[in-house]
């Protein structure tokens, strides 16, 4: 059964849209829905979910008390999942893992299913062997926005943009290159795309005010060793990969900046490294959701993203170096934790000091706690 995980501090209007979509495609009996509440999530959201629960659907609103009870078996990890944070989705991931959901799908509360794409049907490729053209990009980086038609009114028409978390030193037009040769691989991660307001960084959004619509007719496998940002808006992972899919905690203060809005980006890169180590692949393309972005102050977003942009450039050697081949995701994730710790210890330069090195030591420690929790649930 599919498991969908989302966290929200809004009224949950998206929930009705997903129910109607699943009804249209005859899939309401195929999915468990985990809506992870936070301290400020309105009661209207809880009631929306519970209405479907009363109909007999396995749709769950997880109250703070529900989450505390579940995490009581993992006290060290519980202490590392902050309130008033989208990091709460980690609780839903673990619950879906406990319940045997496969695949486990992460969505954001401002992304809506679209009529032309069977949301669950397209994500059903996760865990399966597929044969598809290969996205090779340039210098082992692929720009998933090249699969979309992009309109940037201030720039006078269609342009190329790059997704949030795509390193600036790797941005070239050749990053949209796709090989004519097809390959076969098992899909560990299926990264669906988004129409409307694309997931680009605040700097791009301020300059371009871009909008997107899908322009692809076929999804792709990322080439071996090829990287691309993966967010939490519309992403499925096979259950076996969840020990490597820890949503990274944000919030450290650095030189007047705050490292934020990169938790999903770091987790997406980390699971890619682990999938490669296990011999699995990442598929990019369908399904497409509509991103109805909740109100944001773009200058605040930019302030939150600047530190991540700097750190990501420094992280390139870590992300571009394969892990040792592994038989399972937990083993790969533990090696990655060691590498993160060693990499951070050797960094210096802008933003790098004890606070940032301590932060990544904490990321590595939390990844180990995450693997241990998954193994405890097995």
Predicted regions and their residues:
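Active-site-proximal specificity loops/subdomain of glycosyltransferases
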Residues: 42-101, 115-128
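Short aromatic/hydrophobic "clamp" motif used to bind/position activated sugar donors
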Residues: 104
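Catalytic beta-strand/loop signature of glycosyltransferases that borders the donor
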Residues: 107-108, 278-289
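Catalytic-site signature of metal-activated, phosphate-bearing donor transferases
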Residues: 69-79, 118-269, 273, 277
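Acidic metal-phosphate-binding loop of nucleotide-sugar-dependent transferases
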Residues: 110-113
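N-proximal low-complexity "stem/linker" segments adjacent to membrane-targeting elements
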Residues: 1-36
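Carboxylate/His-rich catalytic cores and anion/metal-binding grooves
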Residues: 32-46
């Amino acid at each position: 059964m599919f498991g969908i995980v989302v966290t929200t501090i809004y009224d949950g209007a998206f929930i009705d849209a997903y129910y109607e979509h699943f009804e249209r495609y005859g899939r309401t009996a195929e999915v468990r829905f985990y809506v992870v509440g936070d301290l400020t999530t309105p009661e209207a959201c809880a009631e929306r979910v519970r209405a479907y629960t009363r109909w007999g659907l396995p749709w769950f609103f997880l109250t703070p008390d529900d989450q505390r009870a579940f995490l009581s078996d993992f006290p060290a990890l519980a202490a590392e999942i902050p309130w008033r944070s989208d990091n709460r989705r980690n609780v839903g991931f673990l619950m879906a893992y406990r319940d045997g959901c496969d695949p486990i799908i992460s969505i954001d509360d401002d992304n809506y299913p679209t009529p032309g794409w069977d949301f669950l049907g397209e994500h059903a490729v996760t865990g399966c062997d597929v044969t598809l053209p290969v996205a090779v990009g340039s210098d082992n980086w692929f720009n998933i926005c090249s699969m979309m038609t992009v309109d940037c009114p201030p720039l006078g028409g269609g342009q190329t943009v790059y997704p949030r978390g795509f390193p600036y030193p790797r941005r070239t037009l050749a990053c949209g290159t796709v090989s004519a040769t097809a390959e076969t691989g098992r899909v560990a991660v299926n990264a669906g795309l988004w129409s409307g307001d694309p997931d680009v960084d605040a700097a791009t959004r301020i300059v371009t005010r871009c909008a997107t619509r899908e322009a692809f007719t076929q999804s792709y496998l990322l080439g071996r060793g090829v990287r691309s940002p993966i967010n939490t808006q519309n992403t499925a992972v096979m259950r076996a990969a969840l020990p490597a899919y820890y949503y990274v905690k944000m919030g450290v203060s650095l030189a007047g900046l705050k490292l934020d809005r990169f938790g999903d980006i770091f987790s997406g890169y980390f699971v890619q490294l682990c999938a490669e180590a296990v011999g699995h692949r990442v598929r990019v393309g369908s399904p497409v959701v509509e991103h109805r972005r909740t109100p944001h102050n773009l200058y605040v977003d930019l302030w939150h993203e600047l530190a991540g942009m700097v750190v990501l450039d420094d992280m390139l050697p870590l992300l571009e170096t394969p892990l040792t081949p592994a038989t399972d995701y937990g083993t790969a994730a533990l090696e990655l934790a060691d590498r993160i710790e060693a990499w951070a210890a050797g960094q210096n330069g802008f933003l790098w000091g004890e606070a940032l090195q301590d932060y990544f030591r904490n990321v590595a420690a939390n990844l180990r706690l995450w693997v241990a929790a998954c193994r405890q649930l097995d």
